[in-house]
Regions:
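Cell wall/extracellular polymer interaction/catalysis modules
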Residues: 1-120, 134-187
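Short cysteine clusters
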Residues: 125
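A hydrophobic, small-residue-rich beta->alpha segment in the mid-to-C-terminal subdomain
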Residues: 128-132
Length: 187
């Protein structure tokens, strides 16, 4: 998925790049926005954006807590001192809202000369590649549908969703690369 906004602004600013870190999945939704398209999206919330008891799945804490200790407890040990892993926490604290993981109806050719081609930047969400037929308007390929199907088969969109920046390579990210990144000692 592409976590870059069309503005390229920092992640703590509305419509800026998608922040790295931990989000909570809050089900699936269908957007009415023309450029997002009809494929189901994954609804996400950040810490502090919503009730803390819900985000941390802990009914014993204050619903309005902004204590970073709770967020830090979700991170693997090698990420507890890695500043980018806290972007979602600080973006939520700054008032950032409404970040979802969605597809797109935009033509990849609009961004042919960009390093993120064939993906489309958004207004701050996570964008997944989809291809649509110019004549029929029907969807021909959807990585978003594959993502939704995978989340659904894994138990549904109720859990944590982790955003990490791998690199700018022009190739698909493999599961091995993700696990390597998560297990890498970052100091």
């Amino acid at each position: 998925q592409l976590a870059r906004s069309i503005s390229g602004l920092p992640s703590y600013i509305k419509n800026g790049n998608t922040p790295q870190g931990i989000f909570r999945m809050d089900g699936l939704g269908k957007s009415q926005a023309e450029f997002i398209g009809p494929t189901l999206n994954i609804q996400l919330t950040m810490p502090v954006e919503y009730d803390a008891r819900h985000f941390y799945k802990d009914s014993t804490i204050d619903s309005l807590t902004t204590d970073i200790t709770f967020y830090k407890s979700l991170l693997p040990d090698n990420y507890k001192n890695y500043d980018p892993a806290f972007e979602a926490y600080y973006a939520g604290l700054s008032g950032r809202t409404e970040i979802i993981a969605h597809g797109t109806t935009l033509k990849p050719s609009y961004y042919f000369s960009e390093k993120f081609y064939p993906y489309s930047p958004t207004l701050g969400c996570l964008s997944t590649l989809e291809l649509w037929n110019d004549n029929s308007g029907l969807r021909e390929m959807s990585d978003q549908q594959k993502l939704v199907d995978a989340v659904t088969s894994a138990g549904g969109a109720d859990g944590y969703y982790i955003v990490i920046d791998i690199d700018d390579s022009q190739k698909p990210v493999t599961a091995d690369e993700v696990f390597l990144k998560l297990n890498k000692q970052i100091l």
